[in-house]
């Protein structure tokens, strides 16, 4: 992780790498976009990690693990240590980040990645309707920020693999579509490619005008009879997943967690750290 921090610092010293990447997309005829992880809790067990913002460190009272429903998961659930969107301060924090992105960068697409990590509220399911209302208002405010730039920026949240799971987490995609506050949605799992995304069910809720994208990830779900581990995707599997998603009515695919593009074995640790 020290290597990661040093690499990030070296990258930042070379200029505004986000602006450079977006400009190159535009130059190459690719619609430039930004994906913002809405509650990323990598390094949750290490409170001094550089992954954690000052806002997160300074406001432990806004963390999800202050709820009883998350306390029993201490040490097991990184997402359970995330920020609680029931607090207006948390929502305002993320809105400020989105405002900076929209006003400072030339982007055509903003993805709100609600799957990394998929925890936003207390696990008190009787409050599900209230959670959905809070998140719908939040997404509406995001839409207003994007529109205030004077140009259209597609808003595409990334949500769970089924409408029921999405709503349980606070994401009422049917209301979002009906109110016209999103341009599309991406459906997927937390870290793996799903064999059975409910694309038809999402389509029935959002209608024909909202684009639906299916998430393709670097690994696939484990299946019955297969060892308890993720299955690495290969080109044939990815083509099969994509064909199935398109047949089910998806408008496109969304690739996630593809760290490299090599058709051979990853480098060894010795090769990696020696820079070979």
Q: What is the role of each PLM region?
A:
Residues 4-23, 27-28, 32-104, 224, ...:
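Active-site-adjacent "subsite" loops/lids of carbohydrate-active enzymes
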Residues 19-22, 26, 147, 206-207, ...:
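Anion (oxyanion) recognition and catalysis
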Residues 34-38, 114, 216, 257:
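Glycine-rich, histidine-containing beta strand-loop boundary motifs that form or position
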Residues 40-46, 118-120, 164, 222, ...:
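Short catalytic/ligand-binding loop motif for oxyanion handling, primarily in non-cytosolic enzymes
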Residues 47-57, 124-127, 171, 199-203, ...:
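Short low-complexity, flexible loop/linker segments enriched in glycine and/or proline
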Residues 89-212, 237, 242, 250:
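Active-site neighborhood of glycoside hydrolase catalytic domains
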Residues 184-194, 230-276:
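Substrate-binding cleft of secreted/luminal carbohydrate-active enzymes
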Residues 210-220, 225-226:
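C-terminal EAL-domain catalytic cores of bacterial cyclic di-GMP phosphodiesterases
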